[in-house]
Amino acid sequence: MVKIRKDLVSSSVIKNASYGYGNPKSHIVIHETANQKPGADAAAHARLQKGGNSRAASWHYTVDDKEIVQSFPDDVKCWHSGSAYNSKSIGIEICVNSDGRIRV
């Protein structure tokens, strides 16, 4: 089983890239990164979030075929699925390999 590695963003990133705390976690939303560049793994996407990612998007976990990285605490309301679900869901991004395949 793959372990979850916590690499949490700072409080300033939480303030600037989320709706803050209070997520009741009633849903799970899964997306793919759509990033097929070499090296675009879970660790790279976690680093993107720690830097305050310029996409105005945030999510809780990034998954690749080697690891799972948690970037935001579960009770934070991340920006990943529109206003209807941001406030009540855990966001997961699945990395895409350079051949376009998803392996988890």
Predicted regions mapped to residue ranges:
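N-terminal catalytic cores of peptidoglycan-degrading enzymes
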Residues: 1-83
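Long, well-ordered alpha-helical scaffolding segments within enzyme catalytic domains
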Residues: 55, 88-104
